[in-house]
C-alpha cells in the first residue's frame, strides 16, 4: 500500500488489476505542470500511485474512484483506508476481480479472497458487484456507489489462480474444478 496526503486528506491505498493505458494516463497527468511520480517499478510508474493521482483529480474519494475507474483501460480494484479508520472498497468496473466483505464477532473486514477472513472466524456478508463502491466500518457497511450491470469476471479464478477454498460469485473454486 501507499500512504497518500492530498486535498482529500491522508489515506492509504492498495490496488490490484492491470492499467493497460498507463503511459497515456501518465502523459495526460504531466500535461499539467508541477506533477511527479515517486514510486517506480521496472522503469514504469507504480500503478497504485497512478490510481491515487487519478483519484486526487476530483473533489471527494467516491468521485475520484469513479473517475479513475472510467479512465483506466483494463482493471482497477482498490481498497482505501481513511484517516478516520474507514475502509473504502471499490471493485473494478467490469467485476473482473472479486471484493468480499466478511462479518464476525469483532466487526467487518474486506478482502480480495474469502478464505482470508474465513480462517479468522468471519463469514461472508457481501460480495461487491462491478463498479460498486462501499464504505466499511467496524459496525457495518454502506453502499456509496451502486453496482453496474455488466459483469465480466475472470474465468481463471476458478480454473487457474483462485485458491481452492475461496468462493467467487457464490461458487467454490474447488467444487468448480472437480
Named regions from a protein language model:
Residues 1-129, 135-178:
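Conserved short alpha-helical segments that host acidic/polar catalytic motifs at enzyme active sites
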